[in-house]
Amino acid sequence: MILSFKHTAEPAPQTLAELPAGRWVEIRSVDRPPAEAPWLAALGLSPGQRLTVLRRAAWGGPLHVRTEGAGELALDLDLARRIHVIDGSRCP
C-alpha cells in the first residue's frame, strides 16, 4: 500500500532582492534595528504588508516596488536583501 501525504507547511521565506518582477509577496520579517521599525512601517515595509517588484535598475541598482498601502518606492539592494517575504498569492 502506498500512502501519499501532501506537504502543507508554509514555504520558506526568500528575500525581496531574489524576486522576479510582477509577483505579489507578503513581508514576513525585516532584518533591521528595532529603532527603524516606525520608519519602515511608514513606507509600508513591515511584516504582513504586501508588495510587488515593478522593475530592477541595471548593474545592481535599486528595486522599484509597489506596496499596497504606501505607493511606489525605490529600495536599495542592501535593504531588499533584509526583507524576507513569502508568496502573496495565498494572502487575503
Predicted features and spans:
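Compact, glycine-rich, soluble single-domain proteins
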Residues: 1-92
